[in-house]
Amino acid sequence: MLFRSEFDDIIKQAREFGYRKIAICDHNTVEGHKQFHDEILLTGVEFDCWYGYVFMHLLAYGIDVDNPILNKYMAKKKSGTEMDIIRIFATRNVPQLIDDIHKAGGIAVLAHPACCWALNLDKFVKKLINVGLDGIEVYYPYQRHRKIFKFHTEETVREIADKYDLIKTGGTDCHNRNIL
């Protein structure tokens, strides 16, 4: 979970780079958003999910963090290794999660699609659209995943987003205080 000082650091950097809005999406928790408010911040959370055989991350932007409908997806406590967190908290009901994100006033976006184990990303995205997906993270540091995933590129993901008229988002996928 991000703490107030980390939110402060990230927001300061965002302002220095001239951003008007940013979302800080911690994994499976919105506790930071409940403790910290700023006009530059768009609420968000990154959910660990399984959809079929594919492990993925689903971003929820613009949600009401006080809406109890999303509580069942939130990590109660972050301890142990990241794989323990994934194993314990990853939801397997993505259609219900997307519906609940919408009920909480948000949009559902597939995060860093090059990390998905879907061999046919287009087909996988179409399945997600059929259960309510709103967008896809097109712009993010693909090079972070290059050693493992070589078959999805920014161009491929952008083409899929255009084909299905999805909202295109971008992110840093940072896991520390330095956003750029």
Outline where the language-model segments fall:
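Charged helix-capping and loop-helix junction motifs
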Residues: 5-8, 120-127, 150-156
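His/Asp/Glu-enriched short active-site or ligand-binding loop at hydrolase and phosphoryl-transfer sites
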Residues: 133-145
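Short acidic/histidine-rich active-site segments
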Residues: 166-180
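Divalent metal-dependent hydrolysis catalytic cores, especially in the metallo-beta-lactamase
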Residues: 10-31, 106-109
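Residue-level marker for buried hydrophobic side chains located in beta-strands
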Residues: 23, 43, 168-170
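Extended substrate/RNA-proximal surfaces in nucleic-acid metabolism proteins
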Residues: 30-134
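Acidic-and-aromatic substrate-binding clefts and catalytic sites of carbohydrate-active enzymes
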Residues: 25-31, 115-120, 144-152
